[in-house]
Design a protein with these regions (language model features):
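Conserved N-terminal beta1-alpha1 strand-loop-helix module at the mouth
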Residues: 1-219
Length: 219
């Protein structure tokens, strides 16, 4: 089970998330209590092991800005978390190593996720980072075989049920492992990662365990 910890704002939290077993960390560049400057995100990312997927999160930003920011900060992925068109998403996907395209639960666009050129497809609630849980059956609209990353109100207490209901490729958490917005709780992170891995210890069989070889990308 692929685990992403989003909303990292400090080097300490980034290093700790990875030490506890996170496969990916997210840096929010969109307006948010967890917003971080791209330069600072890049500094933190450079302290992390090369196998970690470092993700810049954007919401309805200009596509040129997305590509330039991700590459300047030397991040490994862009996450588009707004109402980006398939054409804009495709454009970004051709200019960054990995693209994550997020859809709100119930969004009819989820059925056409493949048109966005995304390596990973996320399903979240309509208010990212709010901690609100949505009806997990709404994730069933994702195309078969995509790497589905489930988000939206997950925490150590409900992630096992979410995995059992949706069978995602990975899970994403932010507020569910915090003491306050942007400040991660070590115990909550440990508990969340342990619960997710216990619920689905084996890789998702519908695709590769990870979307590409992080090590090769750095050569």
């Amino acid at each position: 089970m692929f685990v992403k910890i989003c909303g990292i704002t400090t080097e300490e939290d980034g290093l700790l998330a990875v030490a506890l077993g996170a496969d990916a960390v997210g840096f929010v560049f969109a307006p948010s209590p967890r917003q971080i400057a791209p330069q600072r995100a890049g500094e933190i990312a450079r302290r992390l092991p090369p196998e970690v997927l470092t993700v810049g999160v954007f919401r309805d930003a200009a596509r040129e800005h997305v590509a330039q920011t991700v590459n300047s900060a030397r991040l490994r992925a862009a996450q588009l978390h707004g109402h980006e068109s398939a054409e804009s998403s495709q454009w970004v996907s051709e200019r960054v190593p990995v693209l994550i395209k997020a859809f709100a639960a119930g969004d009819k666009g989820l059925a056409t996720a493949r048109d966005h050129g995304a390596d990973i497809v996320m399903v979240d609630n309509g208010s990212p980072g709010s901690g609100q849980v949505f009806d997990w059956s709404l994730a069933e609209g994702a195309p078969d075989g995509v790497r589905l990353l489930l988000a939206g109100g997950l925490n150590a207490d409900n992630v096992a049920d979410a995995i059992a209901a949706v069978h995602p490729w990975g899970v994403d958490v932010s507020s569910g492992v915090e003491t306050s917005p942007g400040h991660k709780d070590p115990r909550k992170m440990r508990a969340f990662i342990a619960a997710a891995r216990a619920a689905a210890p084996a890789p998702y069989e519908g695709g590769e365990e990870v979307p590409y070889d992080w090590q090769d990308d750095l050569l």
